[in-house]
Amino acid sequence: TFDAKNYTAGPTDVLPVTMLDFSDSDAGKTWVGDIKQGATCNLTINGNNLPDDWYYDNDWFQKEEDGTYTFKAITGRYTVQADFTHKSFRIWTMNGNEPMALNADGTGAIWIIGNEGINKPTWNAVNHGWWTGTDSDVCLTPIKDKVYQVTLTIGKQLRATDVNFKFFGQADWGIEFKGKDH
């Protein structure tokens, strides 16, 4: 827009900001909704900016200089769940109201299920092995159609002395990725 009286111009489009506010209550720990790839997100705890000691997953979000976060995954429906004990978030893709599974054409979701030597934000945050479900498994970030990303660091998300995991097509037993010798 242009103001002819004051010779000032304004933005032609105002980009929406996705507000993800969490509180330490049963109802306040989980956000479910649609997010567009590249969307600007405000991650807040009780209405305040995300504290520096909270872990945000670089596979899902990129922190910007202004304190907002850019959503890196493809456009879709997601669950973002705050873990106040470990000051972090668990994030997974959704199909309606259910966790997303891998589709026959390669779209959907890929999950990691493993022993207590792997998890996010740290390998010992969810310290029980081979359990299934969104509280235990790691959903890979879909960054493009049929392209998934996960970043794991030895000593943080991977225990250096004992790591054992597999890729699955759902947050449960079922579709399992296997090598040629299996």
List where the protein language model places each region:
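Insoluble glucan recognition modules
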Residues: T1-H182
